[in-house]
């Protein structure tokens, strides 16, 4: 039921964004399409905690933006993307007593992601700069993964990896239990628009995962295992129409 409630909140949030178009203001009808690319810096929010470095990966895909209204000084738009993103985690490995080990482990996970964003901007619509914020739900679907493990692999007396709180079950994962994931994303950025309908944007975002990649039942090891992502992105759009 928890996942159903979370999904209902996301759906309500998105339909609230759509209602922006119904506000009283100066009507706009501008559709821009293009491409985006950048970097994703990811960790997994594990409970019990696993100490990690930032996992670095690429993120790129297609972007679409529909500008529907200018409400006083606020330019209102809906933005959707379909992106290929490299996520995962990279462990900072300690032994059961908290001492650093030479062991290394990294899990690379590839996703197709669909952010559906409300975009509010202030500044020039063409021929200048515009500041904007983004907020909305994001959905993802797992495609594949791979692991990188050092030749040095420290074991305890029972033959298991020597780790804090005896937590090592993450190494047994071949694929996540839950391939579909969702959460909330938000960010801010700057856009430069030409007078000929071309737009270059740079933004930074934070994604907070609401779903777990591993099962979290009473008999499972992890109570939580969700993606947490900081990303930086460059986007190029050109207007298909501007009415």
Regions found by a protein language model. Give the residues of each.
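Bacterial Sec-dependent N-terminal signal peptides
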Residues: 1-30, 36, 234-243
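Short loop/turn motifs that connect adjacent beta-strands in outer-membrane beta-barrel proteins
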Residues: 23-31, 69-76, 123-130, 194-199, ...
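Short glycine/proline- and aromatic-enriched beta-strand/turn motifs that initiate or cap beta-hairpins
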Residues: 23-65, 177
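Predominantly the C-terminal beta-signal and adjacent terminal strand-loop region
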Residues: 28, 181, 186-243
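Residues on the lipid-exposed face of transmembrane beta-strands in outer-membrane beta-barrel proteins
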Residues: 35-39, 60-66, 84, 114-122, ...
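Extracellular/periplasm-exposed beta-strand and loop segments of Gram-negative cell-envelope proteins
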Residues: 43-55, 87-112, 142-181, 212-229
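N-terminal hydrophobic signal/anchor transmembrane helix of membrane proteins
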Residues: 65-77, 85-90
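Hydrophobic, well-structured mid-protein blocks that either form specific transmembrane helices
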Residues: 102-144
């Amino acid at each position: 039921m928890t996942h159903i409630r979370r999904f209902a909140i996301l759906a309500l949030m998105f339909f609230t964004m759509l209602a922006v178009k119904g506000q009283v203001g100066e009507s706009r009808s501008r559709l821009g399409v293009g491409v985006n690319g950048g970097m994703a810096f990811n960790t997994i929010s594990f409970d019990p905690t696993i100490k990690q470095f930032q996992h670095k990966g690429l993120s790129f895909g297609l972007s679409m933006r529909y500008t529907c209204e200018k409400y006083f000084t606020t330019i209102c738009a809906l933005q959707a993307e379909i992106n290929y993103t490299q996520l995962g985690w990279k462990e900072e490995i300690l032994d059961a007593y908290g001492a650093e080990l030479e062991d290394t482990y990294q899990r690379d996970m590839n996703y197709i992601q669909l952010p559906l964003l409300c975009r509010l901007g202030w500044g020039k619509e063409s021929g200048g700069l515009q500041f904007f914020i983004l907020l909305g739900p994001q959905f993802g679907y797992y495609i594949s993964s791979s692991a990188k493990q050092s030749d040095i692999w420290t074991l305890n007396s029972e033959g298991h990896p020597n780790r804090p709180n005896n937590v090592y079950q993450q190494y047994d994962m071949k694929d996540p239990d839950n391939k579909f994931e969702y959460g909330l994303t938000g960010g801010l950025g700057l856009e430069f628009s030409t007078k000929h309908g071309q737009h270059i944007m740079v933004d930074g975002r934070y994604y907070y995962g609401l779903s777990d990649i591993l099962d979290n039942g009473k008999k499972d090891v992890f109570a939580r295992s969700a993606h947490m992502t900081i990303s930086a992105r460059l986007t190029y759009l050109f207007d298909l129409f501007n009415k």
